[in-house]
């Protein structure tokens, strides 16, 4: 009698949470003049909407305001001073495209005073999304039965958790970890432009502002229990690092800046970062989906993979032996 041999055991695939994240997002402004697109959802997102789909969570840094407040807190007559105001109705577009949570901790969220900041938070919530970035606040959400906490930081001390106050950030992460299984960090920090391409383990300054030591901050927050660190603010992509099994993305660059961002040089290199984490927060795998920005700041897929090549180079240069493996097709492995 011949007995059938038992089928070999196949290891179950690790259940993961998939996050997709993009950097700085401005859909246009109607202040001080009208720089808004016609048919905004189609004109701004049609080329990248398929790439944004398919995640359990979709995140962006919303670097504008959603308000009708008439006067700005900034003197835009001074050189290199900009104020962004986007119609509140545009919040629904972001929801329809698929965004789940937006950071409002950045240097434009107070462009229209506290009222504009409060309006932005209210309009994001009314559209069915969540936000992170209020000082002292932790945003909780549940995905696949797992409680996730988000904490947003910037260099703006008054309204946001500050990148330079590391001990306060550590305390927030420890507080979040009491209720959440995973803690995700969004940070608007670091200097801007070409000279800021490389990550350095030192305080970064930009026009006299202290923009944080992002290496020290990310490591301290992960030591305290954070599981993912998403950076934005330098307006160009930066290196990736793996620290204690957690992924650090030091900058995702510009994602969308309709007629408001410079897209010259690395300012036009963009991406959608895809990250898979296990239920304990360990980095499992990821992918760089490279994008390019048009002269008007509209994203589309980049067939030349320039962003992937740039981030490969930066990761090897800035974190030799400490970065994840970035393959030529954009796949990221521990």
Predicted regions and their residues:
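Acidic, metal/ion-coordinating pockets
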Residues: 2-334
């Amino acid at each position: 009698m011949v007995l059938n041999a038992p089928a070999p055991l196949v290891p179950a695939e690790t259940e993961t949470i998939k996050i997709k994240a993009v950097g700085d997002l401005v859909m246009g402004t109607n202040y001080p003049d009208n720089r808004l697109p016609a048919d905004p959802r189609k004109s701004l997102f049609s080329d990248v909407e398929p790439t944004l789909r398919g995640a359990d969570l979709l995140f962006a840094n919303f670097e504008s305001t959603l308000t009708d407040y008439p006067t700005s807190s900034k003197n835009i007559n001074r050189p290199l001073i900009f104020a962004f105001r986007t119609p509140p109705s545009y919040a629904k577009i972001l929801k329809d495209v698929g965004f789940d949570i937006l950071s409002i901790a950045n240097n434009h969220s107070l462009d229209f005073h506290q009222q504009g900041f409060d309006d932005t938070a209210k309009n994001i919530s009314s559209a069915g999304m969540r936000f992170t970035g209020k000082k002292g606040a932790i945003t909780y959400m549940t995905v696949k039965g797992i409680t996730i906490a988000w904490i947003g930081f910037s260099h703006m001390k008054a309204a946001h958790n500050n990148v330079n106050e590391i001990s306060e950030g550590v305390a927030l992460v420890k507080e979040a970890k009491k209720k959440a299984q995973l803690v995700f960090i969004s940070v608007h920090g670091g200097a801007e432009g070409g000279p800021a391409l490389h990550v350095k383990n030192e305080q970064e300054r930009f026009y006299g502002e202290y923009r944080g030591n992002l290496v020290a901050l990310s490591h301290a927050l992960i030591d305290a229990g954070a599981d993912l660190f998403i950076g934005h603010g330098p307006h160009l992509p930066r290196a990736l690092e793996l620290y204690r099994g957690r992924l650090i993305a030091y900058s995702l660059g510009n994602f969308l800046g309709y007629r408001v961002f410079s897209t010259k040089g690395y300012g036009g290199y963009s991406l959608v970062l895809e990250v898979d984490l296990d239920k304990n927060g360990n980095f499992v795998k990821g992918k760089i989906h490279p994008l390019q920005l048009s002269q008007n700041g509209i994203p589309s897929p980049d067939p030349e993979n320039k962003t992937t090549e740039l981030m490969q180079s930066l990761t090897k240069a800035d974190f030799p032996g400490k970065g994840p493996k970035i393959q030529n097709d954009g796949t990221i492995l521990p």
